[in-house]
Amino acid sequence: MGTGPLTSGVRAGGGNTGWLWMSSCNLGSPVLPISFLFWLLLAAPGARAAGYKTCPPTKPGMLNVHLLPHTHDDVGWLKTVDQYYYGILSDVQHASVQYILDSVVSSLLEKPTRRFIYVEMAFFSRWWKQQTSATQDAVRNLVRQGRLEFVNGGWVMNDEAATHYGAIVDQMTLGLRFLQDTFGSDGLPRVAWHIDPFGHSREQASLFAQMGFDGFFLGRIDYQDKLNRKKKLRMEELWRASDSLEPPAADLFTGVLPNNYNPPKYLCWDVLCTDPPVVDNPRSPEFNAKTLVNYFLKLASSQKGFYRTNHTVMTMGSDFHYENANMWFKNMDKLIRLVNAQQVNGSLVHVLYSTPTCYLWELNKANLTWTVKEDDFFPYADGPHMFWTGYFSSRPALKRYERLSYNFLQVCNQLEALVGPEANVGPYGSGDSAPLQEAMAVLQHHDAVSGTARQNVVNDYARQLAAGWGPCEVLVSNALARLSHYKQNFSFCRELNISICPVSQTSERFQVTLYNPLGRKVDQMVRLPVYEGNFIVKDPHDKNISSNVVMVPSYYSETYQWELLFPASVPALGFSTYSVAKMSDLNHQAHNLLSRPRKHKSHHVLVIENKYMRATFDSGTGLLMKIENLEQNLSLPVSQGFFWYNASVGDEESSQASGAYIFRPNVGKPIPVSRWAQISLVKTALVQEVHQNFSAWCSQVIRLYKGQRHLELEWTVGPIPVRDDWGKEVISRFDTPMKTKGQFFTDSNGREILKRRDDYRPTWTLNQTEPVAGNYYPVNTRIYITDGQMQLTVLTDRSQGGSSLQDGSLELMVHRRLLVDDDRGVSEPLLETDTGDKVRGRHLVLLSSVSDAAARHRLLAEQEVLAPQVVLSLGGSSPYHSRATPKTQFSGLRQELPPQVHLLTLARWGPKMLLLRLEHQFALKEDSDRNLSSPVTLNVQNLFQTFTINYLQETTLAANQPLSRASRLKWMTNTGPTSYPEPSKLDPTSVTLKPMEIRTFLASVQWQEHRPA
């Protein structure tokens, strides 16, 4: 077996002890709650038989070929989730997950040497609930013996370009918790498995490492990168996935699979394949065993040349394979027997059923020194002119709906945690966060939020989100009634983005409650559609505050034309309630008059400004021409406008067309939507706006609120016209004279920042075939350029593709509509309905000094992702209980969190348990002006108002292992030795967060009983 690997904590394969109460704290009674004890029992490492200990024996001195039987089951793509599970619409795609799992389990039970891996808990959990107790017991035994192994373990195999890190963590937690609850430590995945996502982010690897994974296997990487890795024997190495976290916290061993995730040529034995079976009867005229064995031996020898050890893998399966598992296993049984029989003739090839975990174990035991990777795997191309950078922006409406749903889910989770059981059963009925949790998890799938599914499947994704919002709205209503001591008919305006809200538009009086999911106070301008008139707005202390009614541009809404504006201040993790009343005609002059946009005369200089910022517009073109930071005395010429790339349908150089996945413009220079904009101006005491109309399908409002340190650009694009038979990919572009040396910066899943360079890859010499598409990168929350003194940052409200194709330039793709499929399997052009979609979104623009930039964009991006939730009511309802005094303002925290600290997760985990994640949201050395990149310490024990923490247990990021007992394999690298410190004992009164560190806790709590005021 060779020398065993080094491990931290318990030895691989488990020990004989359960969880010790290490890295935890007893804050109250010495008796642990039953739910907590049950959780400890499930996660006891002493029970971990399924892991490295159950791996099959290999043969030293031979080339060991690990066959990895697997299926790749998309959670929606050409068919919906339900259609895939049940096997509906076989004429679209022959695929049925329920039959796959039935068949695999049956085949595994036939022979003890057979093995299989499974990934998607969205499917497996559904199948599991439909099984008999006998079948469940049989599956538990298979898992315990390592014959059925779970890899990844998330609800889905998530996308890595269009996903926010918080949503990734949530979906992984959901899937891994199902495995923990169902199989205990036997079901603990040790390996991450992303074989189909179209490029890989550095933050994804960091998150996996923090979840306790030992390794990460990839299917798709750039074709040039792969060739280079094969030549340099770098198909496997250590990914150091953070510049801030001290190694090995974000280190993850990463391997590139030899054949994406498909079986080798001629060795596909699924009902969906056409390769002949193994015929081992020499009397048969179809006898092919000898030929297949010789082919296999040559294939194994050739593949070994690209890897460093005497172990290699072959993925035996593909999309929705194993519906008839017997076909696969019967032929692999023969292959294994026939190939291994050649050892008596001198063959040095040993083939075996295996799993990614067992393969990783052998690599670790080899005790080699591995190279280190520090960048990411974007952008991905599978051939010349074939860059998968279009999906960064595909289906922007779905991308925004997903981001809004993440926002609302955190609100729902937090209120459920703050209030406890009364949020689930209250005056408005039964509330539940689970449906939205599951819908959001499904949306992280690499064909969901990516925008790469068929239109009917996209519609179904939206349906799932909408269905999840309902139970959460009930829960939020119950919780707000409990916290405010008042029962009201709450209304959730889901269509505020298109200026529709029936309560505010039809009511003479109403109340506006804003819940703030951040751990710090937030000031925000509220905008609500109203019918023409003037209004009095009162704050939570019943004092009149400033408000304005402004006209909405006619190209925004055909029905309602006015919006009410007022400034709101909402405490940390709490709410504020404002009352609104329409004034009678007699009182109009006592309040601000309505503000209508005024046509701008070209000979006047056009400026909008407040005490912090000024934006100047070209009076001839109507375009933005300069931004000034008055606070820091910075001025930058900035021209912003909308352009579109003419989408390729294929040409003489390549047949590749632009599509849902691929971005390929016909030419490198985009076409302006218009070289000028028709403009009008709104100026009130609260806001100054320039309304720009570029065309019938493209408009924008550039606004500056009172006291705001950033410029807001609210764009409306679509339906994109295609009657000219030209597909169009629309960008918003900012041009400046900044000298940026061909460099720009993008975020990785909303967290750490990566430097990008045009026409450059850090680990190989790039042959650039697409100078536009090949320089596009995913932008989840921000992109910026800098000259070393000033920094221009643009924040997004959804994931988009972005780049800087010329010095001082920055562009983001906001919408795309295409007429041709890109030949990647969807077989449907990205038309988005017959007429196309109209999409509205926001870009927030910051101009600041480099030293101050991080403090600005970190906090603003956090507020953009987790904005206050607006809830309306008519007021005047009954008290929550007798003698209750209504509350119009509330905070769930005893004190605000420091600006460095983000409350990433606060959610119910059990009847008396909560899940808590605290995050340091600044990178190392990122902020010097305010010292925000320094470690910060806080008291968790006395942090919350509504409950008392009795016990606190620190866990890995996905909350499925105690941190003190988490065991990860150790690896030697060419960068030198790495220290492996033991987790320190937890003191809940003094929890320290280092830059970019996330700490995860499970807490046993007691909610306060409500007392009549």
UniProtKB/Swiss-Prot annotation:
First and last residue of the signal peptide: 1-49
Cofactor dependency: Zn(2+)
Function, as annotated: Necessary for the catabolism of N-linked carbohydrates released during glycoprotein turnover.
Active site per UniProt: D196 (nucleophile)
One GO cellular component term noted in the UniProt record for this chain: lysosomal lumen
Disulfide linkage: C55-C358, C268-C273, C412-C472, C493-C501
Reaction catalysis annotation: Hydrolysis of terminal, non-reducing alpha-D-mannose residues in alpha-D-mannosides
Originating species: Mus musculus
UniProt-recorded name of the protein: Lysosomal alpha-mannosidase
GO terms for biological process, alphabetical: learning or memory; mannose metabolic process; oligosaccharide catabolic process; protein modification process
Cited InterPro entries: Gal_mutarotase_sf_dom, GH38_C, Glyco_hydro/deAcase_b/a-brl, Glyco_hydro_38_C, Glyco_hydro_38_cen, Glyco_hydro_38_cen_sf, Glyco_hydro_38_N, Glyco_hydro_38_N_sf
